[in-house]
Amino acid sequence: MEKNVTPMIRQYLDIKKKYKDAVLFFRVGSFYEMFFDDAIEVSKLLNLTLTKRENVPMCGVPYHTSKEYIRKLILFDKKVAICEQASNSTSGGPLEREVVEVITPGVIIDEDFLNDDINNYLVAISDYKDYYSFSYIDLSTSSLGIMFYENGFFEKLKRDLEKYSPKEIIVSENFYYEYSEKLNLSRFLINRVPTWHLDKDIAIKTIKEHFNILGLSSLGFDEEKPYYISIFLIINHIKNNLKNLLSNIDKIDINNDSSYMFLDDVTQVNLELVKNNNDFSSQYSLYSVLNDCKTAMGKRLLREFILNPILNISEINTRLDHVEFFCKNISLTVTLRETFINIWDIERIISRIQMKRYIKKDFLFIEKALSVFFTVKKLFDKHNFDYWNFDKFEEDSISKVYFLINSAISSAPDELIKRGYDLKLDNLKDLKINANKYIDQYLESERLLSKINNLKIRKTNNRGLFFEVTKSNYAQVPPHFMESQALNSSKRYKTEKLISLEVDINNAEDNVVAFEQEIFDEIASNVVMHNKVLKKVAEFFAYIDLVVNFGYLAKKNEYKRPVLTSGKEILLEKSRHPVVEHYTKNTEIFTENFVRINKEKYFCLITGPNMAGKSTYLRQVALITLMAHIGSFVPASKALIGITDKIFCRIGASDNIAKGESTFLVEMNETANILRNATEKSLIIMDEVGRGTSTNDGLAIAYSIIEYILEYIKARSLFATHFHELSSINHQAFINLSMKIEKQGNDLVFLREVEEKPSLNSYGIYVARIAGLPLRVIDRANVILESLVGREGNSCLEFLPHVSSDGNDKEILKNDTDIHIKLNEYLELKNFISNIDINNITPFQSIELLNQIVLKVISQSS
């Protein structure tokens, strides 16, 4: 086909060969056109009209509305290569064209494509010579970081993939083939690079060139330990796709695992920290409850805090001090929250300016933010709030940026640079606006000089501006007048000044636009010189917005300050589940509960029926512990919490069909991970471990797990189960808890309140009844349960009424019905008698009760 195509299509095909994995937006006039397979695919995804020209499938989108179409393609995890017309053709062939950028989900910087409260991460994973590392970058916020995996590579990588939720991942071919299935990488957009691209010497050279350094040690790397290969993969990827848009990246954050609480991928999911497990939105997550921040920067920092709880007590207490200050000074808190509404996302704006992707409003937003910055400083001084980490030099730098923008950038919609900022620009603007005025002024000066009272300046399309002099005044024509045309009754003249004035007037509009842009770019360059302190301002706003938010929520929700210790306790009084309480506050009052764990008593077994609140209680303890470690007040009247290095939460499981793993195997994998990695300072949450296999196997496994935790790990643990036999475990660290149940006749009331004793019944049949199972099924279950009570043996089936397989099942069941009814009547009578309190009835009441029993027996006998 290529032999018969037009020169433009041949040009398209040549460019497309270089960007096979991207949709090529090929600029043709005022449209971006797509051809061949791109056109077919995009027309379906975006519901565009697919046409054909010379048998070539094609579709297109207007240039001025292209952003929306690109945004939609990015949401489909597509890469988009933008091919622009580079210049006019001089050879008679097609216009020169080149790809100016490749937009992919992981390298978005356009605010229209970004979510305000979520970082947009591109991740690279390297296993070069078994030096495992994980690097991440958010171009929109200029954040670049790396994790070294010196041990526990696989579990840490799973954790970080869940934590960072990257939009795009770069891996080597070898890594992809080895780990794609194990890590379920198909859920991400993957860029595979040939393994031979992972070259240590090229990586060192590339990183040194980007950061303009002599050696990698200044960045914190040992060149003999090539963890930095993942950084190289990121830099190389962005250079290849976005040309020179790495100018905003000037440092690398090297993350230290030991500073943060470990939350594996399963725990992040089970606790629903930043997204729920239904539609994966933030609603019903801990993040949604704690997020009442007013700035995009504060929202992103909250997400970072939740996923990275800290372990340093001093640092936690500093945060808590700030939260307490704003909780107590609520009028200041309200004022700040109202003020922060006026702050735009300057963290991302500063990055765009560094990458030369700025527009006028970006500078106006910075000006507004810096104005708020100085307002906040005055408020802090007034209220004696001592958190201020800017020195005099930095404050002066911030002032310079503010006054530069304030004096230069116009807020008027039809003006870029303010009048008065640059005299030359003002003159150009005046010339553009007052052209006729300047012509008249010059005409008047020449009239006075020549004394030709009827001297005129006229204009034609062919000759432009000229003086017109009538015959009677020829003798008075000044010597600097140059004749340009003679007519019958007059002559036309030009002067050097008139020619210059005409040129200036004709060029004024273009000159204003060009000179304004020159000044604008110069202002941007000046602002970039202060980028470090401006980023510090952005970080300041993010932190203050967050602790103000925490203080506001503490006051509003009656959260209390937790006390963090170096011990092993988790002591909570009147504690509540923050998420459940938040989303049910308008319909019910949340039942408060205690938690009493210490170094002597650290393992809690929780028994009781489904629906009684066991799972809520488990998550509640984990979430409150985590909240304390991020510096938030907690939903409890009192909280004393020992520093917790890891939280493990194994609640519920489902089949992993993709890996061929059953529910039970998934459960055992998760449990194995906990037993391998938990320490004495960890918190373990387990719910229904062992339920996915036979009763005896499940009970044995659960018992052995508890024994292992008690004897070897000694971690603080909450273990919910329906294996009531486990409550007989005898160990000094063991605590039996259960959920209170209140009987009301044949009904049960779940009080959702914890008490220190084991439950002896799971009330499963009752739960099945209120869930709506058919009455016949419920009756049958009661019969079977009664037949099982007190029995012993290898199989419960030997005690059950048999059902044949010869087609007579229904008849047998029908014949059994009377027996079932009689047994139920017997059980009802037994229940009636067992509820009589003989110590608290009068003689008359006893006779009445005896009469009721006789009547029931007669009724059942008839």
From Swiss-Prot:
DNA repair recorded as keyword: yes
SMART domains in alphabetical order: MUTSac, MUTSd
The keyword Disulfide bond belongs to this UniProt entry's keyword annotation: no
InterPro entries on file: DNA_mismatch_repair_MutS (IPR005748), DNA_mismatch_repair_MutS-lik_N (IPR007695), DNA_mismatch_repair_MutS/MSH (IPR017261), DNA_mismatch_repair_MutS_C (IPR000432), DNA_mismatch_repair_MutS_clamp (IPR007861), DNA_mismatch_repair_MutS_core (IPR007696), DNA_mismatch_repair_MutS_N (IPR016151), DNA_mismatch_repair_MutS_sf (IPR036187)
SUPFAM superfamilies with a match to the protein in the record: DNA repair protein MutS, domain I, DNA repair protein MutS, domain II, DNA repair protein MutS, domain III, P-loop containing nucleoside triphosphate hydrolases
Keywords: ATP-binding, DNA damage, DNA repair, DNA-binding, Nucleotide-binding
Gene3D superfamilies: 1.10.1420.10, DNA repair protein MutS, domain I, MutS, connector domain, P-loop containing nucleotide triphosphate hydrolases
Pfam name, any one: MutS_I
Binding positions (ATP): G608, P609, N610, M611, A612, G613, K614, S615
Segment forming the signal sequence: none
Domain of life: Bacteria
GO BP annotations listed: mismatch repair
GO terms, molecular function: ATP binding; ATP-dependent DNA damage sensor activity; damaged DNA binding; mismatched DNA binding
Annotated PANTHER family: DNA MISMATCH REPAIR PROTEIN MSH1, MITOCHONDRIAL, DNA MISMATCH REPAIR PROTEIN MUTS FAMILY MEMBER
Family that this chain belongs to: Belongs to the DNA mismatch repair MutS family.
Function recorded in the entry: This protein is involved in the repair of mismatches in DNA. It is possible that it carries out the mismatch recognition step. This protein has a weak ATPase activity.
NCBIfam families from the UniProt entry: mutS1 (TIGR01070), PRK05399.1 (NF003810)
Protein name: DNA mismatch repair protein MutS
Organism: Borreliella burgdorferi (strain ATCC 35210 / DSM 4680 / CIP 102532 / B31) (Borrelia burgdorferi)
